[in-house]
């Protein structure tokens, strides 16, 4: 292992002692606290003063104190005014994990809770002999079905074939570029958020690495290795210089065909000069507290048999979020166009938008009423189905005005469970005339899970 990473790992292991439970000497399993004791132990000074003065615990204050207490112990508050300590933790579980669980009814927290489970499990089951794991974001996004296995393949497919498919599907290249750019950014954001949550509670340490592909003359074989500090400095400087000189963003280097081609040619001379064939970014994850990692799975009621359900849920929630993001961007563009129009009344008339709604700020008011009503019904249906049985395999899709965005989502994000019980893309690339001979890891779902609509009965 590289000495600079080994030194950091040893430093992080030393810091684990700081993540201890300060309440272990105050409470124990089986303790039954009344409201006053509950507030005095876990409340802030201000919360304690307010309770002492009023002898009342308002709901917002109770929730705030409970969220803090749940970082250190499991509590049963099924009986009003009684707080039974079910278990005292050795380490703090962290406020963000408690938030994911406590506010599970919101889609964002539910998504983060499920992602936390599968990321934690994946790290624990894939670590190497050094207690570490190379974590490539897109690889794991595919494994967790945030995206389907069309995603990376279609991004880098031959441009002539891509154009044929885009024309066949009625998708513009700019829409595809914007969607890929947005999704890539979201993949990075949501996965790094979970890694940061685990790092904050001293369960893991994360290092961003630059990996390179080289060829060794002695055996004429290719190897993926971590770049040295000198190699990383040369490659990073070349990228920064190119972006500054050509006034382009980082994402443009990989999504816009003409820019990417020029960038690749520019980088080739730099890479050749240091004997490198290609490069990519990855994250090195090291476990520094495996006890806490395992406890997170227990605390969040993780069950390995539920992994297929988690994957289906993640795909639904992530794809739905991406469609909403795309729609919001379209709304903002239209609002800007309306505001910049010299003749607002004429613009609204030509676009069949009600002039009376101009004074309202919410874009939804500009959408024809039948679309609004349809969307409300869809959202109500989704909420009812989720609250009743959380059957993610049967949730209806939120209505999105932009059909082009829906087609892109179906192609590179959405998955379905086929008749063989496997999670596969909604639109397989081989159905579009693409050689799909490459073997991909598929996720099998047991017959029992399918029969129960994705819900496993205990």
Q: Could you describe each region identified by the protein language model?
A:
Residues 1-458:
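Electrostatic interaction modules used in gene-expression and signaling proteins
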């Amino acid at each position: 292992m590289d000495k600079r990473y080994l030194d950091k790992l040893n430093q992080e292991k030393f810091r684990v002692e700081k993540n201890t439970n300060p309440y272990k000497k105050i409470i124990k399993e089986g303790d039954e606290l009344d409201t006053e004791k509950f507030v005095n132990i876990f409340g802030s000074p201000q919360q304690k003063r307010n309770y002492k003065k009023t002898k009342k615990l308002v709901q917002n204050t109770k929730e705030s104190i409970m969220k803090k207490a749940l970082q250190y112990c499991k509590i049963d508050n099924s009986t009003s005014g009684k707080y039974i300590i079910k278990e005292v933790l050795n380490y703090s579980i962290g406020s963000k994990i408690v938030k994911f669980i406590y506010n599970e009814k919101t889609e964002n927290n539910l998504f983060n809770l499920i992602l936390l489970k599968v990321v934690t499990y994946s790290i624990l089951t894939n670590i190497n002999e050094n207690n570490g794991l190379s974590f490539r974001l897109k690889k794991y996004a595919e494994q967790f079905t945030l995206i389907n296995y069309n995603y990376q393949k279609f991004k880098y497919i031959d441009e002539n074939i891509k154009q044929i498919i885009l024309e066949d599907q009625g998708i513009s290249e700019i829409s595809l570029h914007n969607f890929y750019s947005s999704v890539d950014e979201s993949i990075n954001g949501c996965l790094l958020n979970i890694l940061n949550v685990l790092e904050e509670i001293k369960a893991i340490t994360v290092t961003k690495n630059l990996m390179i592909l080289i060829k060794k003359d002695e055996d004429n074989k290719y190897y993926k290795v971590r770049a040295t500090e000198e190699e990383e400095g040369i490659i990073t400087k070349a990228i920064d210089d190119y972006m500054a000189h050509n006034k382009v963003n980082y994402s443009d280097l990989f999504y816009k065909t003409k820019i990417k081609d020029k960038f690749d040619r520019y980088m080739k001379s730099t890479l050749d000069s240091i004997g490198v064939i290609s490069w990519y970014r990855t994250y090195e994850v090291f476990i520094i507290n495996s006890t806490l990692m395992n406890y997170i799975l227990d605390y969040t009621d993780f069950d390995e048999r539920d992994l297929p359900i988690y994957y289906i849920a993640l795909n639904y929630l992530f794809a739905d979020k991406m469609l909403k993001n795309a729609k919001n961007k379209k709304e903002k563009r239209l609002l800007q166009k309306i505001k910049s129009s010299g003749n607002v009344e004429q613009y609204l008339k030509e676009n069949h938008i009600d002039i009376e709604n101009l004074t309202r700020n919410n874009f939804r008011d500009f959408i024809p009423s039948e679309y609004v009503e349809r969307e409300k019904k869809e959202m109500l249906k989704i909420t009812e189905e989720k609250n009743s049985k959380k059957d993610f395999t049967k949730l209806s899709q939120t209505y999105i005005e932009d059909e082009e965005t829906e087609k892109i989502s179906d192609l590179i994000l959405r998955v379905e469970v086929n008749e063989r019980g496997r999670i596969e893309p909604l639109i397989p690339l081989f159905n579009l005339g693409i050689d799909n001979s490459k073997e991909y890891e598929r996720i099998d779902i047991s017959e029992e899970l399918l029969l129960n609509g994705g819900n496993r009965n205990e």
